[in-house]
Design a protein with these regions (language model features):
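Glycine- and aromatic-enriched membrane alpha-helices
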Residues: 2-441
Length: 441
């Protein structure tokens, strides 16, 4: 983010900057329903609604946490060591319509940041699709938001945050607090819950690829608000971030398809959608630091590397259902590290990457930030997951997973065609069974 210190000024907010950030906030909020469609199309028919619900309920849960204390802890004055903010603005206390953050109303800035927190939590759900206990997810999201997302956001963007102000690593729009935290958390929960029934044995292809493409399109559209909005103003930096976002999404798509064509002999719609997202993930931290040429390379590298990374789960035996690790963790690492290579003074205001004579110093700072955030996130998320699994169970029962979480947890099906799953007839005994196991969810 361009502005990291909360300020209050007598001057009025700039109307142009405010109008742009209002639009950007709405665009980023749209990304969560887009993600729901993207994920919903990738799962099997028996768990579509559950996947949608995990994203939509995250909107409500994270919003409440953010308004009560999350914003204050993330963006309030540093409480010491650059680790966490204070509770001065708990319940949004002291933030009225006249409060200004830079050139925009503070309440708008807080809402913009809220939309980032929402989609980050929702992203994690893709790693545990088809097998997570819904009631456990309702507890996990607020706890994870407070213990993982909020501190990391303060480190990167908050007043006095240690990554930005002491280490000197750069992250324009969320490679560390959004992409790497969601990916590392997804990996941790994969290990806590274990693989789906039939992993590496049964075909688990996306059930609705047009739905996946629609979701990817909405994500791409919203990403312009995500990245260009992080300039916090209607200015040249926002324009550069906007164009870099478009460029990296395109080369990410092409890079993934190139690998598919060479490796598998055919480009796929799933590959196109995933490649675009991989490029967008990688440009998120770097869109305000690299030139257009750098953005093209960042997207291409992410698309190609992530297309290989999504297959690691079969070799290493972790079931990352919807490739959160392969796309968001790997893509986030690629984009964050490449700042140290392609950063230009004209974009950053001073910092230069290796390619432009800056040496290895900035690359080293980026690497330290990546390592610390990934390790902290993985460790804390794994601990939360293990605790919830012990206290209330984090994994759905085998009966729920076999029948499908839509019917057994939500008492609904996405497609009311008299069939459940891949053409399997619905037994009359399924509905009573669903009502019985619903009490366990």
């Amino acid at each position: 983010m361009e502005t990291t210190v909360t300020t209050f000024a007598a001057a009025h907010a700039d109307t142009g900057d405010t109008a742009w950030l209002l639009a950007a906030t709405a665009l980023v909020l749209l990304m969560t329903p887009g993600l729901a469609l993207f994920y919903g199309g990738m799962v099997r028919t028996k768990s579509v609604l559950n996947m949608l619900m995990m994203s939509f309920v995250s909107i409500a849960l994270v919003t409440v946490v953010w308004l009560v204390c999350g914003y204050s802890l993330a963006f309030g004055d540093d409480a010491g060591g650059g680790l966490i903010g204070g509770l001065k603005h708990a319940g949004m206390a002291g933030l009225g319509p006249d409060s200004v953050q830079g050139t925009v109303p503070t309440l708008l800035f807080a809402t913009f940041q809220l939309t980032f927190a929402i989609i980050t939590a929702a992203l994690v759900s893709g790693a545990i699709a088809d097998r997570a206990k819904f009631s456990a997810w309702l507890v996990f999201v607020p706890v994870w938001t407070l213990l993982v997302y909020v501190p990391v956001s303060h480190w990167v963007w908050g007043p006095g945050g240690w990554i930005a102000h002491h280490l000197g690593a750069l992250d324009f729009a969320g490679g560390l607090p959004v992409e790497i935290t969601s990916g590392a958390s997804g990996l941790a929960l994969c290990l806590v819950l274990g693989p789906r029934l039939g992993f590496k044995k049964d075909a688990m292809r996306p059930h609705n690829l047009p739905m996946v493409m629609l979701g990817a399109g909405l994500l791409w559209f919203g990403w312009f608000g995500f990245n260009a909005g992080s300039a916090l103003g209607a200015n040249g930096l926002a324009a550069a971030a906007f164009l870099n976002t478009l460029a990296a999404g395109c080369t990410g798509l092409l890079g993934w398809l190139f690998v598919e064509q060479k490796r598998d002999g055919h480009p796929t719609t799933l590959g196109a959608a995933s490649g675009a997202v991989a490029g967008l993930v990688a440009i998120t931290p770097s869109c305000g630091s690299v030139s257009l040429l750098g953005a093209l390379v960042v997207g291409l590298a992410a698309g190609a590397l992530c297309s290989y990374a999504v297959s690691w789960k079969f070799k290493l035996n972790y079931d990352d259902s919807l490739d959160v690790v392969g796309v968001h963790l790997v893509g986030g690492i690629v984009g964050t590290l490449l700042i140290g290579v392609f950063a230009e003074k004209a974009m950053t205001g001073g910092t230069e990457g290796l390619l432009y004579g800056g040496g290895l110093a900035q690359l080293g700072r980026q690497a330290v930030a990546v390592a610390v955030v990934a390790a902290y996130t993985f460790g804390v998320t794994y601990a939360i997951g293990r605790l919830l699994d012990k206290v209330m169970g984090f994994r759905a029962t085998e009966e729920q997973e076999h029948t499908g979480l839509d019917l057994t947890v939500h008492a609904e099906t996405a497609y009311d065609h008299g069939v459940l799953g891949h053409g399997a007839p619905v037994s009359p005994s399924v509905v009573p069974s669903a009502q019985k196991v619903q009490s366990q969810a």
